[in-house]
């Protein structure tokens, strides 16, 4: 299987798999959706900040599917190229540090 070339391609494939799971595992997928909503709701940190944190964690943990979905959300939230670059610098540092 070829690697996805864009976050849209990646998220499309995963979304198809998640739709199938919603049919066969509705309780699990409902719980996952509730967890995602609780973890990204407005609080002391705004939605964009929470998504930037989530993307940094996804990058450091090398979760391609997670990266795709968080990039997709951040694009919708108006994240600038400079913000993405700053986040990438920090994520690379945290994921590839000396310890």
Language model segments and positions:
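Alpha-helical scaffolds flanking conserved acidic
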Residues: 47-52, 81-87
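C-terminal structural segments of small proteins and small subunits
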Residues: 85-99
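Iron-sulfur (Fe-S) cluster-binding segments and ferredoxin-like electron-carrier domains
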Residues: 69-84
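Short, thiol/selenol-centered motifs that function as redox-active sites or metal-ligating centers
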Residues: 53, 57-69
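Short acidic/histidine-centered micro-motifs embedded in hydrophobic/aromatic stretches
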Residues: 35, 55, 87-91
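Acidic, glycine/proline-rich low-complexity segments that act as flexible tails and inter-domain linkers
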Residues: 1-49, 75
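Charged/polar positions within long, soluble alpha-helices
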Residues: 37, 65-68, 72, 96-99
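A short, structure-level motif marking secondary-structure boundaries and short turns
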Residues: 20-21, 54-56, 99
